[in-house]
């Protein structure tokens, strides 16, 4: 059933992308929950989907499109006060999905890319370009390095902007940098489970980890491990599903999100 699993170049690429996305999303997700910006993460995912659709239409790498539009969305949200960000995120979410629908229509009708909608919105790890794994790993390492450099002031600003400002932290700049890192995280998640489901990989492991520990550093490490376990478990189950329904593979994104949900339910049950 699992013959040739680790020997497959496609599987290796999927494991690399999924693991990189999950590690960064787990860490960023804890900050996102602490800052109360889960909705902003969802909005950036939908905005980035229009970038992915545009990339398909132009025949360039979807990862570049996802990150480009996600970055613009993050910079746009960064200009707003956190209290006003939900309103801006809601408008951005609707606009992003509308643009995605239009661009996917052109991608299908003009370029004949029939599977573009499924790939952009729900992900297709096994169809990722061969070099995408290296780019995903590099992006995740860059994001984690930036988080390590900004950890203390960013954590303080996430818990209390007023206290962080009194301590001399540049709260506005930290907010913008956080949204840039969030855009990068959403980009990698969208490559794994698609734009619509990327919030599950961003918020699910983080919420689970925060149920099990209240120490931020421990929660980030746990969220990264949980996310990677869900991503790799999802890839393994999708690979195994080929023998369940011969000739057809179940979506990787389904198994990843199912693992995320199961881990959260188990954590909630254990905490009573």
Q: How does the language model describe each region?
A:
Residues 1-7, 110-128, 237-248:
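Membrane-interface helix termini and inter-helical loops of multi-pass transporters
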Residues 91-150:
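Transmembrane helix-bundle core of multi-pass membrane transporters
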Residues 152-155, 268-272:
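Membrane-interface capping segments at transmembrane-helix boundaries
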Residues 133-205:
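Helix-loop-helix "hairpin" substructures at the membrane interface of multi-pass membrane proteins
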Residues 14-17, 61-68, 86-90, 137, ...:
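Loop-to-transmembrane alpha-helix initiation sites
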Residues 1-22:
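Membrane-interfacial amphipathic/re-entrant helices at transmembrane-helix boundaries
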Residues 30-111, 209-224, 237, 241-249, ...:
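Short loop segments and helix-boundary regions at transmembrane helix junctions
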Residues 23, 27, 45-50, 94-95, ...:
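Hydrophobic alpha-helical segments embedded in the membrane of multi-pass proteins
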């Amino acid at each position: 059933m699992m013959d040739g699993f680790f020997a497959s170049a496609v599987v290796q690429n999927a494991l690399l992308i999924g693991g990189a996305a999950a590690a960064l999303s787990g860490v960023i997700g804890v900050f996102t929950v602490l800052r109360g910006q889960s909705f902003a993460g969802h909005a950036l995912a939908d905005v980035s989907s229009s970038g992915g659709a545009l990339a398909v239409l132009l025949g360039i790498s979807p990862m570049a499109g996802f990150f480009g539009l996600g970055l613009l969305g993050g910079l746009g949200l960064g200009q707003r006060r956190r209290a006003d960000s939900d309103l801006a995120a809601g408008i951005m979410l609707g606009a992003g999905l509308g643009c995605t629908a239009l661009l996917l229509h052109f991608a299908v009708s003009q370029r004949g890319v029939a599977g573009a909608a499924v790939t952009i919105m729900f992900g297709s790890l096994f169809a990722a370009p061969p070099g995408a794994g290296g780019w995903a790993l590099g992006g995740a390492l860059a994001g984690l390095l930036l988080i390590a450099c900004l950890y203390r002031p960013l954590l303080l600003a996430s818990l209390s902007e007023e206290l962080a400002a009194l301590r001399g932290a540049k709260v506005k700049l930290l907010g913008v940098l956080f949204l840039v890192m969030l855009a990068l995280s959403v980009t990698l998640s969208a490559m794994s489970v698609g734009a619509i489901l990327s919030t599950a990989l961003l918020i699910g492991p983080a919420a689970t980890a925060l149920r099990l520990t209240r120490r931020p550093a421990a929660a980030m490490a746990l969220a990264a491990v949980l996310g990677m376990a869900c991503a790799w478990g999802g890839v393994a189950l999708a690979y195994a599903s080929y023998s369940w329904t011969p000739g057809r593979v179940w979506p990787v994104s389904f198994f990843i999100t199912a693992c995320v949900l199961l881990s959260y339910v188990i954590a909630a049950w254990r905490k009573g």
